Amino acid sequence: MGQLFSFFEEVPNIIHEAINIALIAVSLIAALKGMINLWKSGLFQLIFFLTLAGRSCSFRIGRSTELQNITFDMLKVFEDHPTSCMVNHSTYYVHENKNATWCLEVSVTDVTLLMAEHDRQVLNNLSNCVHPAVEHRSRMVGLLEWIFRALKYDFNHDPTPLCQKQTSTVNETRVQINITEGFGSHGFEDTILQRLGVLFGSRIAFSNIQDLGKKRFLLIRNSTWKNQCEMNHVNSMHLMLANAGRSSGSRRPLGIFSWTITDAVGNDMPGGYCLERWMLVTSDLKCFGNTALAKCNLDHDSEFCDMLKLFEFNKKAIETLNDNTKNKVNLLTHSINALISDNLLMKNRLKELLNTPYCNYTKFWYVNHTASGEHSLPRCWLVRNNSYLNESEFRNDWIIESDHLLSEMLNKEYIDRQGKTPLTLVDICFWSTLFFTTTLFLHLVGFPTHRHIRGEPCPLPHRLNSRGGCRCGKYPELKKPITWHKNH
């Protein structure tokens, strides 16, 4: 009953909107009929012919949709990250960031610069390879570690690298790896060249390696950045994603002259501590942290102290467990995201190798509805042979995206219209339509209303029996044939 009252309160608004819908429907029907007549008359065909004859026709979908795109300058995004580029298909340069004046040069050569008899071997510690007098030493060591991790270098099984011997006169950073076939390096040359191609994104890298000697080395050394080549943001993404799963734990510095109980990473264990200062005849006790527990640590003969320690330890242990669990989950999430991103980049690299269109995550296209301002989700503008595809090469994708956009807009509009119609009005419309259909069927079938003497006028208001006589007995039975009639 309350729903019915609410419906009657909204009747003026419903009638007003229904009238508008009816007017729009009549207008659309009239306009559509007029357009059909004009189309059948051939007027539109003549105008189109005179307008388009001798001119090029651009392809459009609908009246309010057009193809638009957006381009990102990814080098601006990676200004503070390491970027790389290639020179002459044989030398790579890794630039630390936009403002750095130095870089690392990665190349393959047959010239022996370092000897195992004179230079030091690297045993999983690249910091010994950088001279202490080199400016930005810590950042250079970090970039070296990034490159080795990106190449998936195993210090235990792969050939041992050699570092430049540090002297007072030579402060150049050089790291040399023997990649030729030999003891401990079987198949390493093909593996490291393939990893370099994947990391720096070039299938034609080191194409002249066959011209070198039988003994070849991978050489990494520092150099001055002089804009030797143009940076590629895709290589920067490869370098960062290869190091995405890297995490390092740090230990915070503790007080030098303090006595406390800590775990492996420097976090305070549950409880407190006390310092006792002795004088000639007396002593002074000063407690820190949890004072009650600290005094219990000093004198733990009471059961209350044992229970207090247990409660405090359990509380701190649960907090430590929660923190460690959150850190592990975050690390796992970052690693999975890095693997997914690296998988996408590898798919694009395979597409480049097969000479098929691929995405370089720079330019994106989308369909914009200029009338409503709505647009589809951006999609990557594919690249083939270092150039973006022509619009005609993915016109089918554009058409499908436009259809999806229009369908989504129509569906949203339909849901909005459905929300403005009260449920009571729908029920009344349904039952009234059902009632109208039922009465229409009954009207078409019809029911006989009275008897009629065949061939004579209607005897109303008298009712006849089966023998043609009046039921009231006023008139005698005529014994004439009768029939049923619906109308008078």
Swiss-Prot record:
Residues with site note (Cleavage): 58-59, 254-255
Keyword Metal-binding applies: yes
Residues that, per the record, bind Zn(2+) 2: 450, 452, 458, 488
GO biological process, alphabetically ordered: fusion of virus membrane with host endosome membrane; receptor-mediated endocytosis of virus by host cell; virion attachment to host cell
Lipid attachment, kind N-myristoyl glycine: 2
GO MF terms, alphabetically ordered: metal ion binding
Carbohydrate attachment residues: 69, 88, 99, 125, 171, 178, 222, 360, 368, 385, 390
Any single GO CC term annotated in Swiss-Prot or TrEMBL for this entry: host cell endoplasmic reticulum membrane
Cystines in this chain: 85-229, 274-287, 296-305, 359-380
Superkingdom in the source lineage: Viruses
Record topology, Cytoplasmic segments: 33, 449-488
List of residues binding Zn(2+) 1: 57, 462, 470, 472
Annotated site residue numbers, Important for GP-C-mediated membrane fusion: 33
Protein family: Belongs to the arenaviridae GPC protein family.
Domain note: The cytoplasmic domain of GP2 plays a role in ER location. It also contains a zinc-binding domain that allows SSP retention in the GPC complex by accepting a cysteine from SSP as the fourth ligand.
Name under which the protein is recorded: Pre-glycoprotein polyprotein GP complex
Organism per entry: Sabia mammarenavirus (isolate Human/Brasil/SPH114202/1990) (SABV)
Record lineage: Viruses, Riboviria, Orthornavirae, Negarnaviricota, Polyploviricotina
